[in-house]
């Protein structure tokens, strides 16, 4: 039995032990509490360690502030000139990679990543596994392999460095012996002690591979068949700058070589760029190897509380078991349906899911917030965008925190941090794979909420995160909202929970004795309901914050509407952008006006009210249910009263014209579809038919590569930044595909039209993303509606990975009305 399977066996044993004495298997309150606590403990143990530094090509750390962090660096060293630009460490878009990422990855177990480094002419493989045991998150191991690419010389020279840093004051990482003056012939072993991790042992094995040499006299000092270690003592705030620190140490070594031998008699570069062996006391330790041709070595981290050291044989066995388990589970959860049953789509799907999960990171630090609450930020006056610009220019922001966040990311090279509106989309595939992991991430986001109900739309925590963000985009404002996409995830969870729990209430369901951690909160509904009960006060606070800060003005302009309360306007508007909407440069009414109403925000609020009504009902709060139902009813009517244009045949933003009258400004595109995209229309609603006509019109929105963000007929199509002004975005297309499926399967006058569009759009989106991935090795931020080419940010395996769910949806090309499985 693989070691990772012990976790499931332990959980099953625990459940059997707890409840064997109850003949009817009903869960008493005390038993529920014990189960809840134990599931929480086991969840934390299985998720403690991971490659949670997704901005690096490979960097392992625990979900603990100020702890052990590690990282991998490498470069070719066959000449003196290229090294500065050839060292790989942080994921970058401009390094000429021929693709990189996880081909298989499970957050609880591990996986395999391939990095096709065309610039260094080497393919790097990182295999990572977690091995449970003890009380500190278990042990882990990684195998690093390098293989020269086809265009590389057989004697390719590559240097590889692994480092371990200790952030916490009082924690220690010490080398067991100093080797000899030139390095270590065999394995390199560190012993560590940490307040949060206990005792541990870290071994970097000698590994396999040839090593270059030379006839230069320096060979007496720099023996490349030995591993060198350099230990440094640095302030905590500099530890994340490992590459810059390494360059400083290498430069010192180069200066020493030139001083000793002169520039005319310099050794070959593979000896020049070797660190001298200086092991000792430190909080940053570089371990360097230099290889010729292919190579392999292991990194073995053993938790002292596990009672057994991890060995290379364990790593070999666990890699095999993890690969087999992943492939088997993927076939069960995300098996592609027709017409995507070819092997190439399964490989593609595994990569997309793995890179989404492989982008999950742990972030810790302070972020920059402007809590001046300047009156200009109320945006109540005409010309408010100029006033808010002046208020921002006063630079009244301050650092707040520290905070911690466990989250996926949109893109490892360009957006390696948490984005609030992206995260809801990220978690939809992850929820199918591991709902308990999903709930852990949702909880992490809501733990960031302030007392008013605000969560920053972008979490830029710490100096390392800020190093990737221009200063003007670092500041977060407590009156800025973002689409509340996490409610999409909570709705899916609540519906799964309802199906499991049936009509039974808390304490009456049968406990699942075969529960596993990936679905414990669904298999045991009492856990899921308790989770919702604990989260609900934060959800309600956020909903009320939206209503207070993002309200739209109905009464001041004598607008006629079913409800006087339900209208909404994004704050944070400029002339050309509403960044807070997530749709940035999408055309809006001009000039901006405090009387604007935004149909996308109204739709988000309708979806939120719908989800909160379900959750409030689940946790037994009937008065709150009524409140949300009233809000939903008002929003449903006001979408038509305030935003429907009969002449345009779509929903539109509204503003106030020069006569102080309510008027609609229609820019056909994603904005026009939002009531449909979020499922707010009934199957027989005539507005639905008009929207389906718009969506399916090839002269407007429908393209061979997906739904365009803006109509081809718009004067703004493809203009200026062209960010949300023509390109195909997968998150919005996913919402459309889900709703087309829903309307196709529900009897109504538009079901056949919805089915036909579903079949075509599903095929177009999958083929577009797949073809670009096959050609370039990457998923992309957006896709060109004319050519289908991926564009903007590469390795955008955030919401573009929704394609894995799209492939797994039903093929309805044959469907005539019989039941098919529900789609979350």
Indicate where each model-derived feature is located:
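Extended, well-ordered alpha-helical scaffold segments
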Residues: 314, 318, 322, 329, ...
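Terminal accessory carbohydrate-recognition/targeting modules of carbohydrate-active enzymes
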Residues: 2-14, 19-357, 361-365, 742-746, ...
């Amino acid at each position: 039995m693989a070691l990772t399977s012990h976790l499931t066996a332990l959980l099953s044993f625990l459940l059997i032990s707890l409840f064997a004495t109850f003949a009817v298997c009903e869960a008493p309150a005390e038993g529920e509490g014990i189960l809840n606590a134990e599931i929480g403990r086991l969840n934390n143990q299985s998720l403690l360690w991971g490659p949670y530094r997704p901005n690096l090509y490979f960097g392992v750390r625990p979900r603990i502030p100020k702890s052990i962090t590690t990282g991998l660096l490498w470069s070719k060293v066959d000449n003196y000139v290229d090294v500065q630009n050839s060292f790989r460490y942080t994921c970058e878009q401009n390094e000429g990679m021929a693709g990189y990422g996880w081909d298989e990855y499970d957050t609880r177990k591990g996986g395999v990543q391939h990095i096709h480094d065309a610039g260094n002419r080497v393919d790097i493989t990182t295999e990572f596994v977690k091995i449970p045991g003890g009380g500190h998150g278990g042990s882990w191991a990684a195998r690093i392999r390098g293989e020269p690419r086809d265009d590389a010389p057989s004697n390719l020279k590559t240097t590889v460095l692994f480092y371990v840093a200790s952030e916490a004051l009082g924690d220690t990482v010490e080398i067991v012996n100093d080797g000899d003056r030139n390095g270590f012939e065999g394995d390199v072993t560190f012993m560590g002690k940490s307040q949060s991790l206990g005792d541990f042992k870290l071994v970097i094995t000698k590994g396999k591979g040839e090593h270059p040499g030379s006839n230069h006299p320096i060979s007496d000092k720099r023996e490349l068949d030995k591993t060198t270690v350099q230990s440094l003592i640095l302030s905590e705030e500099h530890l994340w700058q490992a590459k810059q620190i390494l360059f400083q140490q290498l430069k010192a070594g180069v200066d020493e070589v030139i001083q000793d031998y002169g520039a005319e008699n310099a050794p070959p570069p593979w000896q020049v760029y070797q660190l001298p062996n200086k092991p000792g006391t430190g909080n940053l330790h570089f371990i360097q190897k230099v290889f010729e041709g292919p190579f392999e070595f292991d990194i073995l981290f053993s938790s002292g509380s596990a009672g057994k050291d991890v060995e290379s044989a364990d790593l070999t066995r666990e890699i095999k078991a993890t690969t087999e388990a992943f492939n088997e589970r993927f076939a069960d959860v995300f098996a592609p349906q027709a017409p995507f049953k070819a092997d190439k789509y399964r490989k593609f799907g595994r990569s997309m899911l793995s890179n989404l999960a492989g982008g999950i990171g742990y972030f810790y630090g302070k972020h920059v917030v402007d809590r001046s609450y300047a009156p200009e930020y109320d945006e109540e006056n005409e010309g408010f965008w100029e006033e808010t610009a002046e208020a921002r220019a006063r630079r009244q922001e301050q650092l707040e925190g520290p905070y911690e966040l466990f989250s996926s990311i949109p893109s490892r090279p360009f957006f390696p941090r948490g984005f609030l509106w992206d995260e809801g989309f990220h978690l939809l595939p992850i929820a199918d794979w591991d709902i308990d992991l999903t709930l852990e991430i949702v909880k992490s986001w809501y733990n960031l909420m302030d007392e008013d109900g605000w969560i920053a739309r972008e979490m830029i925590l710490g100096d390392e995160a800020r190093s990737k963000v221009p200063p003007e985009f670092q500041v977060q404002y407590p009156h800025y909202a973002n689409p509340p996409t996490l409610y999409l995830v909570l709705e899916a969870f609540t519906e799964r929970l309802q199906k499991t729990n049936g009509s039974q209430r808390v304490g009456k369901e049968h406990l699942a004795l075969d529960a596993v951690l990936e679905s414990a909160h669904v298999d045991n509904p009492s856990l899921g309901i308790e989770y919702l009960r604990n989260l609900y006060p934060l959800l309600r606070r956020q909903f009320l914050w939206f209503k207070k800060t993002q309200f739209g003005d109905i009464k001041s302009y004598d607008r006629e509407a079913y409800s006087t309360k339900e209208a909404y306007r994004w704050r944070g508007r400029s002339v050309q952008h509403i960044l807070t909407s997530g749709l940035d440069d999408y055309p809006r009414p001009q000039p901006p006006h405090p009387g604007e109403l935004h149909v996308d925000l109204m739709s988000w609020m309708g979806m939120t009210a719908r989800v909160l009504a379900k959750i409030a009902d689940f946790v037994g709060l009937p008065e709150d249910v009524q409140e949300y139902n009233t809000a939903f009813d008002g929003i449903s009517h006001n979408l038509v009263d305030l935003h429907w244009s009969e002449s345009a045949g779509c929903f539109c933003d509204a503003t106030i014209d020069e006569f102080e009258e309510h008027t609609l400004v229609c820019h056909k595109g994603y904005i026009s579809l939002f009531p449909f995209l979020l499922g707010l229309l009934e199957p027989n609603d005539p507005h639905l038919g008009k929207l389906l006509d718009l969506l399916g019109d090839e002269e407007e929105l429908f393209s061979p590569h997906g739904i365009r963000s803006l109509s081809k007929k718009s004067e703004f199509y493809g203009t200026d930044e062209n960010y949300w002004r023509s390109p195909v975005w997968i998150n919005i297309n996913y919402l459309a595909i889900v709703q087309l499926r829903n309307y196709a399967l529900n009897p109504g006058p538009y079901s056949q039209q919805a089915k036909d569009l579903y079949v075509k759009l599903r095929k177009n989106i999958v083929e577009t993303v797949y073809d670009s991935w096959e050609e370039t090795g990457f998923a992309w931020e957006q896709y060109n509606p004319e050519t289908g080419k991926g564009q903007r940010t590469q390795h955008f395996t955030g919401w573009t990975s929704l394609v894995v769910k799209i492939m797994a949806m039903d093929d309805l090309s044959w469907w005539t009305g019989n039941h098919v499985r529900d789609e979350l």
